[in-house]
């Protein structure tokens, strides 16, 4: 008998009038809000404004969420594509299924294109968001706890996760290995959502600490490379603890391969930027100049609008 364990929530949604609110969505939204706050705080230190971050967020986040959903559906096709799945299930995001690797890939691409369009230095934008991303991911992982999903192998450790939903066993009662899972009522499972939360928060703290400690030595973009290395390394071992179904390629789960690629790309990016990366101070001066131009244009537009309104009143 297990005397100590982590209990699972007894609910994953609630009703407000005719609307159903899913805790999974709330966790993601809170994570996004906290990440935007961290990003904006760091961005303003480089000479930017909150409005710049707000505009970038409104463009990037929806695309990142679509990328996260599509990556999940593509890497677990049995539930979403014929002959075993239903395409309509792709739209059922409230049931869970958002893969961060897809979100990172699409979100990074869209953010790069937007920064290029607005003439913002992307390298320091990437550095500004580097610790914000793992914090957002840590908060979002609580959604997996509410959904009772993405847990790990059975364990007897005192921090094992106790499930209270029969359907929570991989949502199919079949373990990833193909064997029948133990009885959820008497078995504890590794809380991989918690492992990743802790890993991400440690990573965010390290990025902030090293970014401050090595401020005179780091090139612009290297803090983002740290994030890629840290998260790729963490997902490599955490993914191997999970028992949810995943496509296997050459003996490794798809997400393990992706995590390895992300880690390697982070290492390469860190080394390349160390040799050839831009100077953060020069990038900050460039951002300050762009910001000054934006504020001047806004001031001119506001003055023109004020004069136009005043003219209309006198007619």
From Swiss-Prot:
It comes from the Bacteria. InterPro entries: Lgt. Its main location: membrane. Pfam families: LGT. GO terms for cellular component: plasma membrane. HAMAP family: Lgt. This is Phosphatidylglycerol--prolipoprotein diacylglyceryl transferase. It comes from Bifidobacterium longum (strain NCC 2705).
């Amino acid at each position: 008998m297990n005397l100590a364990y982590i209990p699972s929530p007894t609910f994953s949604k609630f009703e407000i009038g005719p609307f159903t609110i899913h805790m999974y969505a709330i966790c993601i939204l809170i994570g996004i809000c906290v990440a935007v706050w961290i990003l904006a705080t760091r961005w303003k230190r480089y000479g930017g404004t909150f409005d710049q971050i707000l505009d970038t967020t409104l463009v990037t986040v929806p695309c990142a969420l679509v990328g996260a959903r599509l990556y999940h559906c593509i890497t677990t096709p049995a539930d979403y594509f014929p002959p075993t799945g239903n395409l309509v299930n792709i739209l059922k995001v409230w049931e869970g299924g958002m893969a961060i690797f897809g979100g990172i890939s699409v979100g990074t691409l869209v953010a790069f294109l937007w920064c290029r369009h607005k003439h913002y230095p992307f390298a320091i934008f990437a550095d500004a968001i580097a610790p914000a991303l793992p914090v957002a991911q840590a908060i979002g992982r609580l959604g997996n706890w509410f959904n009772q999903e993405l847990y790990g192998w059975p364990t007897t450790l005192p921090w094992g996760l106790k499930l209270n939903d029969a359907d929570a066993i991989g949502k199919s009662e079949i373990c990833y290995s193909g064997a029948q899972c133990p009885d959820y009522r008497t078995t504890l499972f590794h809380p991989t959502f918690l492992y990743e939360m802790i890993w991400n928060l440690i990573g965010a703290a390290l990025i902030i600490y090293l970014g401050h400690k090595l401020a005179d030595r780091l090139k612009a973009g290297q803090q983002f490379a740290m994030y890629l290395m840290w998260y790729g390394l963490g997902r490599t071992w955490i993914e191997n603890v999970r028992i949810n179904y995943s496509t296997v390629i050459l003996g490794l789960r798809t997400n393990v391969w992706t995590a390895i690629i992300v880690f390697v790309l982070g290492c390469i990016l860190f080394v390349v930027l160390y040799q050839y990366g831009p100077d953060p101070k020069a990038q900050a001066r460039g951002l300050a100049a762009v910001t000054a131009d934006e504020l001047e244009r806004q001031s001119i537009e506001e003055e023109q609008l004020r004069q136009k309104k005043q003219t209309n009143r006198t007619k």
